[in-house]
Amino acid sequence: LKTYMKSAIFFLIILICLPKTKARTILIDPGHGGSDEGAKTSKYAFDNKGKRVRRTIFEKDLVLSVSKKIQKKLKEKNYRVFLTRSVDRSVSLEKRASIAQKVNADLFISIHANASYQKLSGGFETYYLNNQSNRAIKKVEEVENKGSQGEDSIVNQILIDLVVKRTVESSKLLAKSIHSRVKKSLEISLKIKDRGIKPGLFFVLALSKRPGVLLEMGF
């Protein structure tokens, strides 16, 4: 989250990625919310009295702001665009997925802003639904799957319903489309590291049962 100011322009890049898609209904999922603050960072700013103060920036607030901008711009392009939350409140991963079913979304895009305690770590990355055994990705899964209830039963449901097999190819194509355009823009203009396109078993993507990606938009 340490490059969150750079990440705030991310929604403009996403707008470039979507105009050619045949999908007309898009569900934007601002990660975290309510008591789940997500990652956080701090910066110095001046208050209304001109005093320099240290302020904390939470991932939940940043991704909500970015998601609202995405929604506004895409609506101007005549897309049907919904948010899983429009205010700072807790929404379970199951509820987020049920919203996708309710609005009959063609695409599910979950917006996050990763973090690291290592100063040299950072960059942007795009995840699509698929199982894997990479330890680093497992750590990301643990963070982003915290809002789920009954993880074991969910994993069984994923395996039984074969959600991964049904959506992996379309989700991977979506991830490649978005990521390639992000890469061209961010690496050149903001010099943010490309951390690649990666598979991940994210419950919110699996439960939505449709093509989707989880975007870690820069840290």
Protein language model regions, located:
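Catalytic-core regions of hydrolytic enzymes
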Residues: 22-152, 165
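Residue-level signal for pocket-adjacent positions within structured domains
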Residues: 121-122, 135, 157, 192, ...
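Flexible hinge/switch segments at interdomain interfaces of large molecular machines
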Residues: 151-155, 214
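Hydrophobic h-region of N-terminal signal peptides that target proteins for export
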Residues: 12-20
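Bacterial N-terminal signal peptides that target proteins for export
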Residues: 1-9
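Short glycine/proline- and acidic residue-enriched helix-loop micro-motifs
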Residues: 156-165
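Active-site-adjacent mobile loop/cap segments within catalytic or ligand-binding domains
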Residues: 24-27, 38-41, 47, 113-117, ...
